[in-house]
Amino acid sequence: MDVDKQMLQWRKRAWLNSNQLYGELTDIIIKDTGFTSSFANLIDNSEVDSFSKNIVNIFTTANKTLPLIKDLIYNEFNTKVLAEGEGSILRGNSIVNKIEGAYVRLIGANYLRFVLSDLVTKVVLDSDLKLEIDPRKLNDYYEDKIEFEKKVAEVELRDNQKSLHNIAQQFLDRITDPSVVVEMPREIRAIADYTAESALRYAPESLAPLVGGFIMLRFFSPAIVTPEYSKLLSSEVAPSKRAKRNLVLLAKVLQNASNGVLFGGKEEFMTCMNDFIIGNKEKMSAYFNLICKDPLNQNNKWSDLEGVKSATTTTTILTPTNTTTSSNGSGGTTWAKPIVGGSKWLATTPSGNTPSPAISNASSAHNGKSNNTTNNNNNNNNNNNNNNNNNNNNNNNSNKTTTTATTISSNSWDVYIKNVQIQDLFDLHRIFDSYKEKIVNKIINTNNNNANNANNNNTNNINNKTAIRVIEILKELGPSPKTKTERKKKETDAAEEPTTSLQNGASMGSAFDECTHMLERSRFLFQGPNDKNDRSVFYLIVNRVKPEVFDNVNPLIAHIFKVMDICVNSPYTLVVDMSWAHISNDLKKAIFTHLPKLAEIFSRKYKKNIDKIFIVHPSAYTRAVIYFMSAFTSRKLKRKIHDIYNWKDLSQYIDIENIALPETSKDFITKSYRVVKVNSKGKRQERLIKFTSNSLLNIDPKTHRIQNEKRINEIDEITSRLGSIEINMKLSGESKKSGSILGTKIGFLSINNNNNNNNDDSNGNHDINESNSRKYICNHELERDHILQDIFETGFKMGLQSKSTKSLPTEYKVIKVNNVGKHQERIFKLTIDSLLNLDQQRIKSENSFAGIEEVILDPHDDDIVWLKFKSEPSRRKIICTVKGEGKLLLEVLTDAINKYQTTIDIQEGALKLDAEEGFL
């Protein structure tokens, strides 16, 4: 029977048990780094970046990234030296390079600032500093001069060469200073040591280029080139075009000094710095020797970082060949006196994460019968591997260093899984699901074919058991809820026929016109009626900005000039509408690539004359973009930015009838999905879908009434198809069987069943009498994926909550006291990101958790809570009608706001990393 590969099907177990299944999947890849490194080598180049960030986030939360990197480095040398030669090791965008880079940027951020901040700031602030040594770029470099006479240019070049030499020496002296090296995170030093150990054994002539390439290319150089994203500069300091070029030249010199490669070839103009490289060769050798030493453990290097007990650690000792000595000339095994204490600059967890206890390798019970079996087998296989390694020194290093059979106590595991970000799990699920056929063909089948090889038999057994269990977990989970992969810009077909220059000109002209028309039709930027002070008002609708807007920057610039240029000679207002905005990876990349260019192109009047910037319905993306733009704007401009959490608050500045926001933005409800619901009779109804911590709300966007609420555990099955925008759900129908319960307070919206069944849905039937199936038609495939992900995330968090001793309600009956003392009965209902204020089933107002400034319990009455919204001048008095629920409301709101803020911080941090990588 043929399998329909286009069909997507999920059963209730997938999301209700996602906590357990995702937990076991991450448990497997963390404890069996041999399998993980084997899988990593199956990843296509298109997935390398995503998988690297994903795996670093998951492993770092468990403090287990280092053993994986060790395996990957050893495997890189084992497989490539003989097959492809020394020149292929750790080159390009390999998985080991990407994981190394992501990891050291994560844990070394504070250390980078400690080492480089003062020097980089000095370079950026020195407006007279001239380091350009490329004769072809002198005219561009000196923006205030038109041209140079040859004689003057030669003098300038000599002066610049001398300055570049001096500044580069200052940087190198600072980086290699032993008192500075002491503060380097030991994790970074360990990676350098793994690289050096492998180089000594397999490629001794490449030791300096490999270690230098790691420490400079992956760590220091990116920070020097993009200091605004590495926080080497304060927020009010922005590098000029000249300063950026100076930093690039410095990074080039430092990079070549670190790997000992002399300039020449395509960069002939840099050969004047070869004396610098030669003169610092001994300094760099001493530096490499120093950073590759563990200051705490002489005999069991890095064992504590790898999660291995020192008493049982087997240390790999490599004897240098006759032609290889240590960098200080005294031999590779010479050690300095151990330095007590670790680096105070180490950052061990992603932004917003609480550090998890290290996952222990000690033997302990682990959840799941299959896991216990696997762990026991893995322990036996590990012992066999150790024996084989002791008896056969020629075995692969990866066998020695593979971390298997990591059993985890339930307490530490619960803490760990709570700190893993759900999007990382979705990405992990998507990537493993995409490569499940390769897991079968390349790992399971290959190991079976090699089963007769005695040297590999034990390792094969471990990898096979792990791989088989991964396939079983993927089957239980079903497809990843993140099915949509965003399309990359299509490359030009090499087979296309060449066009003549005349055709090219016509094509370029028509392409420009087509882009211009596309920009005009999208109406992502337009002018609205003036504000109350008769100032021009422009609207930027972020939801309408697509990645293709940036495909050709010239039409974009022309369009912005056309819309704004006439009016920006005098003060004006900019309204940035973030309603319904989703920033895709393609759009993020485009924004981070082109915004700096646009900031440089537009004249000073655009910045000077802007009076106010209103951010309507702000989000994590807003904060990240504002942070990103801070490098190109002034502190004065940032003071002009105002967050608007309710679009009607714009009426303080613009007459309400003149607010030109789209109607969909005025209907905006935080993280909702505007869909079409099709009932069993085929009737189509517009709906907003919104999630609470345990249910799905169906909201009529016209009346703002909650038509019904479906618990996540009432959804039995979900189906869709690849490329489809439809979601089909089968429901258990429990709500129909328990209609009487819905009138009671059980944490779900109390809906009376006394409606007249003769009325249709628009007259108040509220979707009560529907069949046990429903269909949603989304606007696009990505939106469908987001709904699926929210269902999985809700189920995941319900699984975490079920382990908690206390489950807080999400619905509260209250009396809201308005400004004039009037009492109003209301229901407060918490969604995943907002507080709904309900009059029966009608949503009177919604406040994002981001818009709540403070929550305070009344000191004299535990049933009174005071709420302060950022959009309102004073606190609101809230009286809980059920005795004792005041403290619960305070606790649940505080917890929800903190979790939401943590999520925002993590998203913002990820966007900042994207911005940094966009310029590497």
Swiss-Prot record:
Keywords in UniProt for this one?
A: GTPase activation
SMART domains in the record: RasGAP
Feature: compositional bias, Polar residues: 346-369, 498-507
One Pfam family name from the record?
CRAL_TRIO_2
Question: Site: Arginine finger. Where?
Answer: R91
One Gene Ontology term, aspect cellular component: cytoplasmic side of plasma membrane
PROSITE patterns assigned to the protein according to its UniProt record, in alphabetical order = CRAL_TRIO (PS50191), RAS_GTPASE_ACTIV_2 (PS50018)
Q: Where is this region: Disordered?
A: 344-405, 477-508
Presence of the UniProt keyword Ligase in the record: no
Give start-end positions of Low complexity composition bias: 370-405
List residues of the CRAL-TRIO domain.
512-673
GO annotation terms (biological process): directional locomotion; regulation of actin filament polymerization; regulation of chemotaxis; regulation of phosphatidylinositol 3-kinase/protein kinase B signal transduction; regulation of Ras protein signal transduction
Say what happens when this gene is deleted: Show spatially and temporally unregulated Ras activity causing cytokinesis and chemotaxis defects.
Give one GO term, molecular function aspect.
Answer: GTPase activator activity
User: What sequence ranges are listed for the domain Ras-GAP?
Assistant: 63-291
Biological role = Regulator of the GTPase activity of Ras, mainly RasG and RasB.
Q: Which PANTHER family match?
A: NEUROFIBROMIN-A (PTHR10194:SF151), RAS GTPASE-ACTIVATING PROTEINS (PTHR10194)
What name is this protein filed under? Neurofibromin-A
Originating species: Dictyostelium discoideum (Social amoeba)
Q: Which gene encodes it?
A: nfaA
